[in-house]
């Protein structure tokens, strides 16, 4: 049974949108957890980067499924933007929780060693280019001293910010109006 948006009040439509976004936020957070795990445990592989770069495609795919299955193929830019933003928001919350658990209970210094190795690599490149590396060192040292909760919160805010920006083109690409659907027939 389909529930069409034009049969609902604004409050009902928002409840529906948020319910789908929560489910799809779970899917996105699983992609991010796999990406994070791959980046930590198999850093020479491109799997972690590929999964991270698949983020906008996963959200767009889920938005198109929401549009098709719940809204009869019609979605406005505004509703698509809200759906995308809520999906990123819920995924960020779940990923923050997963990262906190990792940093608090599972990390034995692997994340810090990866940051230190990255600093050495970047420092060599910067020095070869004649750029001062002190600011990079200070930034990495600050990150290393953060507590698990602070580090998880930092990543959550970054994900929400990037998700807000990525929601704009995703909503623009995935929106469909009634007239557009009639033109396709």
Give residue ranges: language-model regions.
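Alpha-helical transmembrane spans of integral membrane proteins, capturing the lipid-embedded, hydrophobic core
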Residues: 21-33, 53, 84, 88, ...
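Individual transmembrane alpha-helix segments
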Residues: 139-164
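Membrane-helix interface/capping segments
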Residues: 64-80, 104
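Juxtamembrane membrane-interface segments at transmembrane alpha-helix termini
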Residues: 60-71, 91, 123-127
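Membrane-interface interhelical loops and short interface/amphipathic helices
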Residues: 106-145
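C-terminal halves and exits of single transmembrane alpha-helices
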Residues: 87-113
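Transmembrane alpha-helical insertion/packing segments
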Residues: 2-67
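Short, charged juxtamembrane terminal tails flanking transmembrane helices
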Residues: 4-14, 174-185
């Amino acid at each position: 049974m389909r529930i069409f948006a034009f049969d609902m009040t604004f409050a009902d439509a928002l409840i529906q949108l948020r319910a789908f976004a929560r489910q799809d936020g779970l899917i996105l957070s699983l992609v991010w957890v796999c990406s994070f795990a791959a980046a930590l445990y198999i850093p020479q592989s491109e799997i972690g980067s590929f999964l991270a770069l698949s983020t906008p495609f996963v959200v767009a795919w889920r938005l198109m499924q929401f549009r098709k299955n719940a809204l009869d193929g019609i979605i406005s830019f505004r509703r698509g933007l809200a759906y995308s933003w809520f999906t990123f928001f819920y995924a960020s919350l779940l990923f923050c929780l997963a990262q906190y658990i990792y940093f608090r209970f599972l990390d034995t210094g692997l994340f810090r060693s990866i940051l230190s190795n990255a600093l050495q690599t970047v420092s060599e490149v910067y020095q070869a280019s004649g750029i001062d590396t002190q600011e990079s060192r200070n930034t990495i040292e600050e990150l290393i001293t953060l507590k698990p909760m602070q580090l998880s919160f930092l990543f959550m805010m970054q994900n929400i910010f990037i998700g807000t920006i990525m929601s704009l083109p995703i909503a623009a690409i995935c929106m469909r109006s009634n007239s557009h659907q009639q033109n396709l027939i």
